[in-house]
Amino acid sequence: MSVKVISPFSQDGVQCFPKLFIISAPAGAGKTTLTHMLQREFPDAFEKTVSSTTRSARPGEVHGVDYLFVSEDDFKQSLDREDFLEWVFLFGTYYGTSKAEISRVLQKGKHCIAVIDVQGALALKKQMPAVTIFIQAPSQEELERRLNARDSEKDFQKKERLEHSAVEIAAASEFDYVVVNDDLITAYQVLRSIFIAEEHRMSHG
């Protein structure tokens, strides 16, 4: 890939090749909020992939920004065409990250951030080089509190996600980095430092 990105963390305009970063977490750990913070601070350097899903949009979600909301038939057609680098069927819903979506971001000369579930993250890393980051709540009790505070999901959905979180947390050791989101600002600074370290490794070999 010939397109390079100017490091947002460098004062001297250091350039490096754009890279794929995968961020995963149990529902309620804060991965979406932390990713949005990174994009707001560095809009020219980072861009999130837009995953496809068959679930309905939640209040405030925008098609083409948060997700590509598609029918189950359309999703299965994409599967038949082998459009996805990774896909999962979770909680009765299909989710997938397409090859075209990752290429779209990287070819713009931006670091690509894929915010996906743990199963998809580990599958995607087998397909192409990536830095994997796991966001974790400080405790299971805090994760449950955050999930219960959500108004966008029904009680049985929250229960399903909480039960599934144990499986996801058990896979944290398979990731390159683990960030504990106890305090949002502190967690963001840790996440930011990971990107600085990875850019330094890319820039200086």
Curated annotation (Swiss-Prot):
<keyword id="KW-0067">ATP-binding</keyword>
<feature type="domain" description="Guanylate kinase-like">
    <location>
        <begin position="18"/>
        <end position="196"/>
    </location>
</feature>
<dbReference type="InterPro" id="IPR017665">
    <property type="entry name" value="Guanylate_kinase"/>
</dbReference>
<comment type="similarity">
    <text>Belongs to the guanylate kinase family.</text>
</comment>
<dbReference type="Pfam" id="PF00625">
    <property type="entry name" value="Guanylate_kin"/>
</dbReference>
<dbReference type="InterPro" id="IPR020590">
    <property type="entry name" value="Guanylate_kinase_CS"/>
</dbReference>
<protein>
    <recommendedName>
        <fullName>Guanylate kinase</fullName>
        <ecNumber>2.7.4.8</ecNumber>
    </recommendedName>
</protein>
<keyword id="KW-0963">Cytoplasm</keyword>
<dbReference type="GO" id="GO:0004385">
    <property type="term" value="F:guanylate kinase activity"/>
</dbReference>
<dbReference type="InterPro" id="IPR008144">
    <property type="entry name" value="Guanylate_kin-like_dom"/>
</dbReference>
<keyword id="KW-0808">Transferase</keyword>
<keyword id="KW-0418">Kinase</keyword>
<dbReference type="InterPro" id="IPR027417">
    <property type="entry name" value="P-loop_NTPase"/>
</dbReference>
<dbReference type="GO" id="GO:0005524">
    <property type="term" value="F:ATP binding"/>
</dbReference>
<dbReference type="InterPro" id="IPR008145">
    <property type="entry name" value="GK/Ca_channel_bsu"/>
</dbReference>
<keyword id="KW-0547">Nucleotide-binding</keyword>
<feature type="binding site">
    <location>
        <begin position="25"/>
        <end position="32"/>
    </location>
    <ligand>
        <name>ATP</name>
    </ligand>
</feature>
<dbReference type="GO" id="GO:0005829">
    <property type="term" value="C:cytosol"/>
</dbReference>
<comment type="function">
    <text>Essential for recycling GMP and indirectly, cGMP.</text>
</comment>
